[in-house]
Every structure is written in C-alpha cells, then in structure tokens.
Amino acid sequence: TRDPFLEQQMSKAWQTALRRTIAAVAMGMAAWGTQAQSTDPLVIGEVIARDRCAVCHGPCGQGVAPNFPRLAGQTAQYLTRQLQAFASGERKDTAMTEKVKGLSPSDIEAVAEYYARQKPGHTPSGDEPLLAVGRYVYERGNRHSGLPPCATCHGKQAAGSTELPRLAGQHPQYLIRQIQ
C-alpha cells in the first residue's frame, strides 16, 4: 500500500534537493560567466590559454612535451607577432593556425601578455661536455660553419627580445628541431 504522508515528504525532499542543485548550477554558471565576460586582458588571456593552448604548452606556458615550445617568459610583443603570423598564414603550422582561428587582435595580445607574465621554465642540466660545446657556440659562434654567436641576437642570458625568442629554459629537443 502507498503511504500518502510518506510520498508527500519524499516529494518535498526531492523538490528541495532539486532547488539546491539548480541554485548551485546557476551560481557556478554565473561565476564562469563573470570570468568569461571579463574585460581584464589577463583574465581573458588566461581563459584563452587554458581553453586553446594548455594541451600543448601547459596552463602556465611551461610546455607539456619537448616538441612544444615553452611560452612562459617570452615577451608579449614576440608572442603577439608569432600568433599574428599563424593567423595570417605567414607562419605555417596546421595545429597553430586552427588554434588562433577566430581570435581577435585583442585576444591575441591578451594571451601573449598572459604568457609573458608567467615564470620561465628551467631545463635540468644534461651532458656537461655537450653543454660546454653548446655554451661555446652560443657565446662565440662557429667560425668553421660561419655561424655567428647566438648571444649576438638572443642576448647574453638567452632571454630574447621583442624581436627574437627567449632560448633560456627551452626544451633542447625543440631548439634542435628549430635550428635544423
């Protein structure tokens, strides 16, 4: 047999639970909407970085694998120019072209500024003799091949500039691929 009193109490409990669930979802959506609707360029940049870039470059630009560059600590001007080059087709990379599709110039500037403000990565030490050769070429170049010192353009500490990328802390495998 059915107990009308028990059914009424259960119905009230379900209604209360449903109201609380709806309220929690609404509050969560409001909080997400506030972040998504923000006019603060750093918030916008962080949202774009998380949604479009983090899978390959990590949420803070530290890179998730050696074949992807670390973006943290690059200058905003350098990153902006690179993203604009992908958007215009001047720089070719299918994945990057897709990722920048639909970003406005201010979105590109926002994500570039976000990554520029992140702490640059650090690459653990490796083979000391090989590091010594690399340091020599970086500081003095290779006169046999005509390669000028990397430091001439990228700076003594490899921090890069508004025109050239930061090399310090970059994944060695990524640098090798770019040089070749």
Predicted features, each with a name:
Residues 1-9:
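Short, Lys/Arg-enriched N-terminal segments with co-localized hydrophobic residues
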Residues 11-22:
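Bacterial N-terminal signal peptides that target proteins for export
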Residues 20-30:
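Bacterial N-terminal signal peptides
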Residues 33-49, 62-67, 116-144, 165:
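Electrostatic cytochrome c docking/interface patches
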Residues 41-89:
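The feature marks the first
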Residues 52-60, 111, 147-157:
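The canonical Cys-X-X-Cys-His
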Residues 64-70, 85-127, 161-166:
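Axial heme c-ligation environment in periplasmic c-type cytochrome domains
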Residues 76, 80-84, 105-112, 172, ...:
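An amphipathic alpha-helix signature
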